[in-house]
């Protein structure tokens, strides 16, 4: 009887011990699963936040380029210079007018990095451009903007068009506005370097953000220390024609989930 009692007692202890061990293991597994699920949700959320912030950044850029474009596009002196392009003096004066924002500034000049101002006729042929700014552009409107303008309906010809596009592997941002008011005589293009505005993405998300070229070159580095406790979350910012333009990498503080 004593031996049987001991055996039953030992078996009971063993069973409860096994149950306890199994419960601990299941608890650990469940905790790990929910942490991973929470982390996955945070990553997806941050990726979406970065995407929205990128679009908000471009909208703010567009606001400044549109304002500058509309100011120049309604300038009577500039319009008259375009109409008199056969005259050498008028052509030189037109270039001076296009250079003026680079020399004397404009409202919002500290918010964008102006690269070039160009003028096209109604057939989208380049007829003049600022002498100031980059000299590495092709002498034509980007394919994307050309297609958008060419496919517009007649009642849309007075609308401005924006585009993030790639020029010789370098992303640029343009706003194209009609030149001449209600009776356009051409188009005016404001071209800026969007790299200048990429740090604004981190300001919007309120998280550390680094930006890279598509080839992996670091463009902008956040000042926060992200060496410990941060998980990178990547988002690719595409040009208007869906070509990859920038790699935006945000960093999620995973210590908050522990």
What does each model-found stretch correspond to?
Residues 116-119, 175:
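Soluble periplasmic/extracytoplasmic beta-strand elements of cell-envelope proteins
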